[in-house]
């Protein structure tokens, strides 16, 4: 290990040794080693050296340069802006120009992006990021001060940005300092091992110092990404040209990019089949079926942590009784739903957020028995809770993607156990609402589509911790809060797995949210598109993508 000490901190070397032992003993797969190592900033050659592997070598066609890649995405709500961005579609529009600090890979690892390296202190309460030397479109140098200025705006309690919810209790406003032109030090509110993921995933886009809301739509935000915005129309889409000054321009083979907006998945699928677009970063499973049979297209897939929550507010009857929540959980045939909606191309859930896409999943699965359908047990629990004659409830949700089909199956399956569920499906705009009218947060019984997150903590912090801003189930558990926060701050991989088991077990037992499955990312592409990333669903890194025409 001595040869690596000049390249990594003592903490990284120590944890690297632990990862090596786990990998050599067979307790950890190659994928798990990549994920757990990359969050500490360990490079792939370093990780490969631990157990004697390097990056796999495959015989691949030589990339061709040129051409414009056309993508179809769901229409964003309103004008896209980095200050208010919250959805995948908005992220797809922003990220070609305003890229992430780290590039999240389909296998869950984190590759350098605008940040070329990162490291933490011994207890993961302080993180140091070193940024690449780059320049904005106007020729101004990109520096650590740009990131600090963006955070000043994004984390300001008065800001319109939703970004603050993901940082709550982790990083406070102004708790970071520029130590030199390319270095920024983050001083966290608590230990957080996955912090590099927090600043790298989702719809957050890093804009230049002096940015004013609305500048992006006006074409005034010349970014440091692989592409430069040429034209943006809120009702149609956006076009881009290659950025010749991008730090990795040699691996950007496309001359340009065009993003076209669509109102529904069926329209996107038809556009792909008709040649209007070349690839679809996200598509509902029901719309994928017809494409699967067409030899001109390929459907790329990757595991994801995205799920449709079936959540119950635990602070009022009938769902304040854990037995009612458990009864509904036992009434559902999870594998049947996965087979019916996804043709088996999804992972069965077990009422906790530690999805198979996460490195801790194997440990959790080994320790926590899978909940399966048991109608008799469901009826017994419902009777014990005082509902021997059954229970009538209204389930409020959104008319979006696969959600209606999913809830109709839940409605049908739960009936056998005594649940009489009435569905109230609203438009997405009405379900999420605004201000004091947000049904997804206020309705006693609801179902929400939660997009993937890069880490378990990124799922837990905004939605499951006591008092969290998007805690739609009103769940509050001191034991869970303690386990989840300890997990976030534990640097030892073995101890961290144990804490993941503790947190997952509490959620599974309390079941504020039924998580039936984790949907895989499905990306249909024309076969002329080469090197297109299979995932993750919320990111679109076009490094190495090219057109075989």
What are these regions (language model features)?
Residues 347-384, 402-405:
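Structural transition elements
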Residues 130, 163-209:
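Surface-exposed binding/hinge segments that line
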Residues 105-109, 191-192, 197-256, 264-266, ...:
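Gly/Pro-rich hinge or "lid" segments in bacterial periplasmic/extracellular proteins
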Residues 245-290, 420:
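Ligand-site clamp/hinge motif
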Residues 371-372, 422-431, 458-527, 549:
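Extracytoplasmic/peripheral linker and loop segments enriched in polar/acidic and small residues
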Residues 1-32:
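N-terminal secretory signal peptides
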Residues 70, 143-152, 181-187, 225-226, ...:
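Alpha-helical secondary-structure segments
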Residues 72-122, 152, 220-224:
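N-terminal lobe/hinge region of extracytoplasmic solute-binding protein
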């Amino acid at each position: 290990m001595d040869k690596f000490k000049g390249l990594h901190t003592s903490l990284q070397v120590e944890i690297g040794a632990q990862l090596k032992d786990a990998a050599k003993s067979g307790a950890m797969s190659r994928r798990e080693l990549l994920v757990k190592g990359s969050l500490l900033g360990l490079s792939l050659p370093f990780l490969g050296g631990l157990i004697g592997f390097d990056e796999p070598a495959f015989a691949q066609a030589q990339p061709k340069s040129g051409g414009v890649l056309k993508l179809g995405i769901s229409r964003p709500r309103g004008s896209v802006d980095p200050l208010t961005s919250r959805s995948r579609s908005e992220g797809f529009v922003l990220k070609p120009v305003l890229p992430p600090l780290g590039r999240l890979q389909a296998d869950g690892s984190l590759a350098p992006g605008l940040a070329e390296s990162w490291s933490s202190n011994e207890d993961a309460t302080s993180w140091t990021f070193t940024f690449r030397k780059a320049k904005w479109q106007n020729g101004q140098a990109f520096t650590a001060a740009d990131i600090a200025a963006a955070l000043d705006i994004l984390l300001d309690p008065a800001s319109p940005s939703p970004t603050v919810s993901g940082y709550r209790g982790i990083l406070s406003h102004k708790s970071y300092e520029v130590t030199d032109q390319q270095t920024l030090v983050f001083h966290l509110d608590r230990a957080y091992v996955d912090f590099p993921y927090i600043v790298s995933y989702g719809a957050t886009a890093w804009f230049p110092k002096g940015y004013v809301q609305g500048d992006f739509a006006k074409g005034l935000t010349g970014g440091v990404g692989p592409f430069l915005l040429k034209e943006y129309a809120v009702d149609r889409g956006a076009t881009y040209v290659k950025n010749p000054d991008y730090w990795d321009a040699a691996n950007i083979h496309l001359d340009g990019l065009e993003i076209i907006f669509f109102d529904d998945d069926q329209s996107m699928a038809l556009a792909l089949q008709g040649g209007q677009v070349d690839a679809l970063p996200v598509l509902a499973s029901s719309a994928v079926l017809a494409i699967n049979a067409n030899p001109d297209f390929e459907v790329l897939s990757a595991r994801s942590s995205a799920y449709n929550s079936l959540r119950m507010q635990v602070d009022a009857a009938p769902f304040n009784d854990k037995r009612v929540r458990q009864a509904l959980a036992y009434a559902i045939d999870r594998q049947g739903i996965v087979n019916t909606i996804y043709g088996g191309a999804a992972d069965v859930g077990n009422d906790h957020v530690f999805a198979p896409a996460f490195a801790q999943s194997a440990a959790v699965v080994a320790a926590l028995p899978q909940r399966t359908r048991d109608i008799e047990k469901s009826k017994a629990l419902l009777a014990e809770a005082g509902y021997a004659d059954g229970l009538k409830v209204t389930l409020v949700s959104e008319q979006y993607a696969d959600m209606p089909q999913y809830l109709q199956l839940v409605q049908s399956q739960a009936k056998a156990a005594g649940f009489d569920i009435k569905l109230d499906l609203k438009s997405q705009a009405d379900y999420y609402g605004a201000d004091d009218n947000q049904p997804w947060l206020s309705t006693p019984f609801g179902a929400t589509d939660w997009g993937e997150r890069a880490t378990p903590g990124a799922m837990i912090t905004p939605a499951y911790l006591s008092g969290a801003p998007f805690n739609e189930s009103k769940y509050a558990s001191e034991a869970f809060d303690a386990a989840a926060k300890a997990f976030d701050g534990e640097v030892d991989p073995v101890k961290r797995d144990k804490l993941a088991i503790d947190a997952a077990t509490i959620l599974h037992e309390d079941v504020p949210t039924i998580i039936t499955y984790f949907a895989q990312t499905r990306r249909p592409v024309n076969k002329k598109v080469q090197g297109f990333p299979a995932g993750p669903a919320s990111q679109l890194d076009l490094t190495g993508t090219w057109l075989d025409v």
